[in-house]
């Protein structure tokens, strides 16, 4: 782990108290529509408006994940096959994070971004399932 990555971890962990607040809402899903020239309501595909702290998280985590492949196997993986590709994003259960290594957390964060690219709201779902917080707590455990 180099100094740049440790600084990236510190910057991510600065956000953890906000994410742990019981009142924290990672995103809202406003109605998206417009009224056309004929007065007809036109619905839009929904997408979230993320909390500013989530947007900051999305700006900060790339400094930590640079250089990790999202699907290749890591030596510490349970199987030699790596992560199965999924257009909707790969996800893990809560137990995964209790033992995850730094590279497994880095890969998870990389996959968060990939999941969001192909599925608006993926990051919201991972926050609501408390997986992002679990990943950050594991980082804190390993590096603080």
Predicted ranges, named:
Residues 2-66, 72:
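Short terminal alpha-helical segments
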Residues 2-9, 85-103:
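Short, charge/polar-rich alpha-helical segments
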Residues 38-40, 81-82, 89:
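Intrinsic-disorder/low-complexity loop/linker signature
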Residues 73-82:
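Low-complexity, small/polar and acidic-rich linker and loop segments
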Residues 125-143:
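Short, charge-rich amphipathic interface segments used for partner binding and complex assembly
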């Amino acid at each position: 782990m180099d100094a740049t990555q440790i600084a990236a971890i510190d910057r991510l962990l600065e956000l953890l108290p906000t994410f742990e607040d019981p009142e924290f809402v990672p995103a809202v899903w406003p109605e998206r529509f417009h009224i056309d020239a004929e007065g007809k309501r036109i619905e839009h595909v929904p997408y979230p408006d993320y909390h500013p702290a989530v947007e900051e998280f999305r700006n900060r985590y790339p400094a930590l994940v640079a250089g990790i492949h999202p699907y290749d196997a890591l030596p510490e993986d349970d199987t030699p096959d790596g992560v199965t590709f999924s257009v909707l994003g790969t996800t893990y259960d809560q137990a995964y994070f209790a033992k995850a290594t730094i590279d497994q957390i880095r890969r998870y964060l990389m996959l968060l971004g990939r999941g969001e690219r192909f599925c608006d709201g993926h990051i919201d779902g991972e926050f609501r399932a408390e997986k992002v917080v679990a990943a950050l707590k594991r980082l804190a455990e390993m590096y603080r």
